[in-house]
Amino acid sequence: MNFETTVGLEVHIEMQTNSKAYSPSPVQYGAEQNTNTNVIDWGYPGVLPEINKGALEFGMRAALALHCDITQDVGFDRKNYFYPDNPKAYQITQARTPIGTNGWLEIELEDGTKKKIGIREMHVEEDAGKNTHNPDGYSYVDLNRQGTPLIEIVAEPDISSADEAYAYLTKLRQVIQFTGISDVKMEEGSMRADVNVSIAPIGSDKLGVRTEMKNLNSFEHVRKGIQYEVKRQERLLMSGGEVEQETRRFDEPSGETILMRSKEEANDYRYFPEPDLPPIHISDDWIEEVRASIPEMPDKRRERYTQDWGIPAYDAGVLTQTKEMSDFYDATVAAGAGPKLAANWLMGEVNAYLNSKQVELSDTALTPEHLATMIKLIEDETISSKIAKKVFKEIITNDTEPKAWVESKGMVQLSDPAKLQPIIDEVLDNNEQSIEDFKNGKDRAIGFLVGQIMKKTRGMANPKMVNKLLMASLKER
């Protein structure tokens, strides 16, 4: 029997607001434990939450970027459960009126196939705190994260493989990062995925019983977890067993999923309207104001790069992997660099430097203006590509103006025929045998002579001009 896979994804993304969703406590990753929290986060009796307008607008921005319809009359609900990192014993969410519905995201697989994945709904809610279990036998609760604004993005069950899930998460992270509402760093917990997996016989009109994997914190774990879970369920069904609805965790060392608990149903959480927060009406004008704040999305940028600037589709994809790189590229071209050469430098030397140092562009001294100036020096043949690499090392580590630095170091390329010709003549006079070799059709003689000229000029001669003058001189001899 053959089966088809159905994957459901619920993705939680922390929003980078200045303060929490319903309290004035600051949002700051990495702060000392329990320093960014207050009585609202602790759930003290008699304290009242207050809606963070910025969090609501960030949620609207994400919903619009994902082509969702905005719910114009939104309310808030309590999701009731007890856990040490949730001292209120409930989470404020949007069970009845999600901020966005009926959206979609287009993914592209490695073979170039494109597919639209539906977005069922998107909620604005709050994060829980963090439990730490120490070897001393005690568990500790850090409430800095408690109340941090989240968006929960619920995909339709349109994903049918581990690779599609991986592509969806990659594209979702890219789109959200471009909106500017989150840094979407899975390693820091600002993007987490819950995965539902089920299988059913091919052609069946009913979905199989699903299992859930919670809080997967890397795309590769999602892919491997789905692959293992599909095989596990296939083995169960083929041996006459049944798939149980349960929550499992992905164990990285073994590459397997391990049972955590039987799955709760929605009614286990006893949802009811949040009595301390009023419903909010989102006007058409407010929606359009938020829409206007959304920057150009990666798909549009790729289209512009390929159609307007002639950049290959693959290169355009690399340049739009992050908003930081794409913004830097746009600014470099705006500063006067040729689009193709700017793309080559960013994808080549710049990316190589960032990867080797494990840093981001913002951690370096490089500016679009300085990179553009260096590229223009290459384009007008003031410096060679070889010299440009030395210039690049200087401008990415120090706040140095490239043109002034090149001139101060005597690195300006020698292109003046009046200065090059005497050097060429001297090399030819000292290498009669190479002239004979050239006349006898031995092309390698040219390479030798060019090398001698470059040696005489300490590598500063313009290779194009050297070749032009050398060929003319050889024809005269």
Curated annotation (Swiss-Prot):
- What InterPro entries does the record point to? Asn/Gln-tRNA_amidoTrfase_suB/E, Asn/Gln-tRNA_Trfase_suB/E_cat, Asn/Gln_amidotransferase, Asn/Gln_tRNA_amidoTrase-B-like, GatB, GatB_C_1, GatB_Yqey_C_2, Gln_synth/guanido_kin_cat_dom
- Its EC number(s): 6.3.5.-
Protein name (record) = Aspartyl/glutamyl-tRNA(Asn/Gln) amidotransferase subunit B
- Which reaction(s) does its UniProt entry say it catalyses? L-glutamyl-tRNA(Gln) + L-glutamine + ATP + H2O = L-glutaminyl-tRNA(Gln) + L-glutamate + ADP + phosphate + H(+); L-aspartyl-tRNA(Asn) + L-glutamine + ATP + H2O = L-asparaginyl-tRNA(Asn) + L-glutamate + ADP + phosphate + 2 H(+)
| Gene assigned in the entry | gatB
Tell me which domain of life the UniProt entry assigns to the organism this sequence originates from. Bacteria
Subunit composition? Answer: Heterotrimer of A, B and C subunits.
Q: Which family does it belong to?
A: Belongs to the GatB/GatE family. GatB subfamily.
Q: Which GO terms describe its molecular function?
A: asparaginyl-tRNA synthase (glutamine-hydrolyzing) activity; ATP binding; glutaminyl-tRNA synthase (glutamine-hydrolyzing) activity
NCBIfam families for this protein: gatB, PRK05477.1-1, PRK05477.1-2, PRK05477.1-4
Give TM regions: none
Signal sequence, renumbered to the chain: none
Function, in words: Allows the formation of correctly charged Asn-tRNA(Asn) or Gln-tRNA(Gln) through the transamidation of misacylated Asp-tRNA(Asn) or Glu-tRNA(Gln) in organisms which lack either or both of asparaginyl-tRNA or glutaminyl-tRNA synthetases. The reaction takes place in the presence of glutamine and ATP through an activated phospho-Asp-tRNA(Asn) or phospho-Glu-tRNA(Gln).
> Source taxonomy lineage?
Bacteria, Bacillati, Bacillota, Bacilli, Lactobacillales
Q: Which GO terms describe its biological process?
A: glutaminyl-tRNAGln biosynthesis via transamidation; translation
